[in-house]
Structures are given as structure tokens and as C-alpha cells.
Amino acid sequence: MEHGSGNSGRKPSWLTGRGILIAVMFLLGLGIFLYPHICDWYYQYQFNKAIAAYDRFQGIDCEGMIQAAREYNERLAKKEEQFLVPAEEREELDHLLDPWETGMMGYVDIPKIGVHIPIYHGTEERALQSGAGFWYGTSLPVGGENTHCVLAAHNGLVKAKLFTDLDKLEVGDRFTLDVLNETFTYEVDQILVT
């Protein structure tokens, strides 16, 4: 008489239809849960690569570009219709603060909410998918009196956080804009929700 293992040729219980269904459902749920985290990690990795490439060029003399941006801001402050930006002016803006012709003019750091993303010219979808976008018709981000720079970024994207947690900032929180060889530190002085 032959003694067997007791299975008599039966499949393990997890290989039954029910076991496979449970395993597939578990893996599907795990994938759905991890997808936003993996995508955010990947996009932050891409943002960090772009910022590192930008920082490698920081050693060049950028004072002329900063001065040209400040002159643009002075002209902008005198305009009555600041938000109407003709195509030729956009062309000029696209070259200001972009010595490497990548479209990137700097990056924004908001430590409280873990934001460290590039700033690109314009608010077209291409720019907003790559980081924050500079709003044409507002001051270039080089500081100065009577200037007001507006940056836009997505919030609520599944694939990247970007400005999703912006509502967690409070009056007094600080953030920085790094543009060419200069770092500009700002403090939240008011919060308006519209």
C-alpha cells in the first residue's frame, strides 16, 4: 500500500477559481492604491532632474538677464492693460530668464508642503504638466518694488501633487523662488479663497 501526501492529486486551495479571484482582486486593489504614489514619485524624480540640470548652469553670469527682466517689470508696471500680452511680447518674455532655451526660468520650493518644482514660461498645458507656469502679464520673478508674479500649477492630479496641498499653507509660511543665480524668499501674508 502506497502512502501519499494526503493531497491525492488535488490542486492547492489558492489555485481554485475563488483563490485566483481573491489574488487578482488583491493585486488590483494594491495597484490602485499605489498608482498615485508611484506616479508622484516618478514626476518628482523628473522635476528633480530638471532642477539639477538647471542648477548646473548657475555658474554663468546672469546679471544681464536679471536686469532685462527688471526693466520688463518696470515697463509692465506702467501699462494700463497688463494682462493683455501681444504675441511679440510673449516672444520676448519666452527668452527672458531662459538662457538655455529649455523654457525653464527657475524653480519654486515650498518646504511646508514638500513642493520642489520647476517654473516654466506660460500656463499652457505643456508647461503645467511639467511644473508651475508663469502667468503672462504679471511681473517676472526677480523681486523688486511694485511687482507681482503669478505662478500657476495643477492641484488634484493623480500623477503628481504639484500645488495640491497649497491650502495647507498659513500666514507666515515661507517659500522661495530660485531664478538664475538668485534666491527670492517670500512669506505668505494673506490667504484669499475665491
Task: Indicate where each model-derived feature is located.
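Solvent-exposed, non-transmembrane regions of membrane-associated and secreted proteins
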Residues: 12-194
